[in-house]
C-alpha cells in the first residue's frame, strides 16, 4: 500500500502582522531576509498594472499552471458548476480575506492568466492583491482598480490557449522564487517579495527597527555627513539614534 505524505498545514500569519509588514520597505525586508540566509526573495521581471500603488502584505493563495492540452483546454471547460478542469473558478471562490493570489504561469506571458472579471471577484472576496509571472488581460479596467495587480505583461489571448490550471494551494515557483501556501507576499512601489510564514513576525519586528534607523540616517546624510560609520551604522551611531529617539526625534538638530 502506498503512503501519500501530506505537508503540515501552513503557519497562519495574523492580520496584525500582515498590516505591520505592509508598512515596511522592501529594502529593509530584503536586507533582513538576506541576513537570515534568504538570498533572493524578490519576484523579478514583474510590474504593477494599476497606477494606484499601495503597499500590501497578504497570505499566499497559490495557483499552478501547466501547458494547455488541446483535448482538455477547450471553451467547454468554462463550466457553470465546479469541475476538475475548471480549477481557476474554484480557486477564485475559495479566496479568503487577507490572501494574495499568486499564479505560477511558468513565466509564459503568451496568454492571460486571468482578467478583470475574476480579479474583481477576488477583490470583493477580500483578497489583498494578485500576482502572476505571466500576463493579465483587460489592462484598461485593471489599471483603474484600487487593488495591487502585478504581472510580466498584458495580452488579450485567452488562458485556454496556453495554460491549464493544474493545482491549487500547492508549492509553486513564481518569477524564479519558491512560494508555499501561507507565505507572506509583500509589495510596495518597487518590488514583490516573499516572506516564509514562519519568520513573518520576526521580519515585522526587525524591519520596523531598520526602517526607523534608516530614516534617522537619511536625515544625517541630508545634513552633509559622510557615510563612514554612519551607513552602515557603527555602534556609536546606533547609540546616537537611541538617544535621538529618547529625546523626541528633534529633526532640527540633525539638519542645522
Question: For each predicted feature, which ranges?
Answer:
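A hydrophobic, small-residue-rich beta->alpha segment in the mid-to-C-terminal subdomain
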Residues: 186-226
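Structural motif
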Residues: 40-41, 59-62, 99-102, 127-131, ...
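Extracellular/luminal Protease-associated
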Residues: 91-133
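Buried hydrophobic positions in well-ordered alpha/beta secondary-structure cores of metabolic enzymes
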Residues: 33, 122, 183-185
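Intrinsically disordered, low-complexity regions enriched in acidic/Ser/Thr/Pro/Gln residues
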Residues: 1-93, 100, 215-236
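A contiguous pocket-lining binding segment that forms or flanks enzyme active sites
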Residues: 132-133, 139-187
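Long, low-complexity intrinsically disordered regions
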Residues: 237-256
Amino acid at each position: 500500500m502506498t503512503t501519500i505524505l501530506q505537508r503540515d498545514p501552513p503557519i497562519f500569519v495574523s492580520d496584525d502582522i500582515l498590516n505591520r509588514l505592509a508598512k515596511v520597505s522592501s529594502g529593509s525586508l530584503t536586507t533582513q531576509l538576506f541576513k537570515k540566509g534568504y538570498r533572493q526573495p524578490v519576484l523579478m521581471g514583474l510590474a504593477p498594472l494599476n497606477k494606484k500603488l499601495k503597499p500590501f502584505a497578504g497570505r499566499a493563495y497559490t495557483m499552478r499552471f501547466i501547458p494547455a492540452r488541446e483535448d482538455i483546454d477547450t471553451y467547454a471547460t468554462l463550466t457553470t458548476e465546479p469541475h476538475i478542469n475548471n480549477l481557476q473558478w474554484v480557486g477564485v471562490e475559495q479566496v479568503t480575506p487577507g490572501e494574495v493570489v499568486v499564479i505560477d504561469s511558468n513565466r509564459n506571458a503568451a496568454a492571460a492568466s486571468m482578467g478583470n472579471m475574476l480579479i474583481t471577484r477576488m477583490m470583493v472576496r477580500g483578497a489583498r492583491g494578485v500576482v502572476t509571472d505571466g500576463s493579465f488581460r483587460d489592462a484598461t479596467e485593471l489599471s483603474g482598480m484600487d487593488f495591487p495587480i502585478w504581472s510580466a505583461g498584458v495580452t488579450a489571448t485567452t488562458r485556454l490557449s496556453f495554460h491549464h490550471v493544474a493545482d491549487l494551494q500547492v508549492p509553486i515557483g513564481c518569477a524564479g522564487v519558491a512560494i508555499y501556501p501561507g507565505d507572506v507576499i509583500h509589495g510596495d512601489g518597487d518590488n514583490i517579495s516573499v516572506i516564509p510564514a514562519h519568520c513573518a513576525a520576526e521580519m515585522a519586528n526587525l524591519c520596523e527597527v531598520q526602517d526607523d534607523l534608516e530614516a534617522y540616517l537619511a536625515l544625517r546624510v541630508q545634513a552633509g555627513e559622510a557615510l563612514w560609520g554612519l551607513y552602515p551604522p557603527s555602534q556609536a551611531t546606533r547609540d546616537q539614534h537611541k538617544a535621538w529617539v529618547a529625546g523626541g526625534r528633534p529633526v532640527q538638530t540633525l539638519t542645522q
